[in-house]
Amino acid sequence: MLDHPESTKEALVQWIRDYFSQNGPSCSAVVGISGGKDSTIVAALCKEALGAERVVGVLMPNGIQSDIDDAKAVVAHLGIPHIIVNIGAAYDALTNAIIQGEGYKTVTGRTDISKDAGINTPPRLRMTTLYAVGQNLPNGARVANTCNGSEDYVGYSTKYGDSAGDFSPLANLVVEEVRQIGRLLDIPKYLVDKTPSDGLSGLSDEDKLGFTYAVLDRYIRTGEIENPETKERIDYLNRINKHKLELMPSFHP
């Protein structure tokens, strides 16, 4: 874990300042606010780097979000401008249009949306929403990616959904390191220690992954792990999900 979290936090804030000075000196940072630790910490870092007036939080429930009050508490505590966009109607309209599409049943053999499509479509709609909001801001915007290094390592994200963005402050920090940074920021501590979940299944991230972030973090940082089955699963997830972090392959004639 971080030996000097204070200096890492200061370096992160400066990194965000430097990114914007080179890639949009007057732009705002647009951050999707879920009410979890990662988006809260990214928003707080952006506020410290750019000032509250240049950070726009976007809350994007899909219909009813059980922890929407946490997301509202984040933007209220940070004092940043925010927009609430309920993507429920867009999700319903898109999935219905797909199901009713000419040839859908013939080609897919289905009359509904698959579980994977149901899980991954909302994050992609949210990323579309963030870019649309950004392009409506007076001075433009850059969209924050809020994934952390532990999630990235095992591919616990949606390609072109929450894995997208313009800049990624937490990509090289594992979960416990992110929490170390969070404890140094002016944010509610219960959000820093909040159990990560997808907000869909009622299960925590760790329940779905089959191992704890503590085990994963240690393995990423030291290569040490006790359970060979857990090591095999982590290695497998890392291998099959590498494409999410790589540029699209292209043919060179």
Regions found by a protein language model. Give the residues of each.
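ATP/NTP-dependent adenylation/nucleotidyl-transfer catalytic domains that generate, transfer
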Residues: 1-31, 45-48, 53-56, 62-63, ...
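Conserved G/P- and acidic residue-centered "switch" motifs that form tight phosphate/ATP-binding loops
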Residues: 36
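Short, surface-exposed alpha-helical segments at coil->helix boundaries
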Residues: 39, 43, 68-72
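Extended, folded domain segments that form the structural surfaces/walls around functional sites
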Residues: 39, 60-61
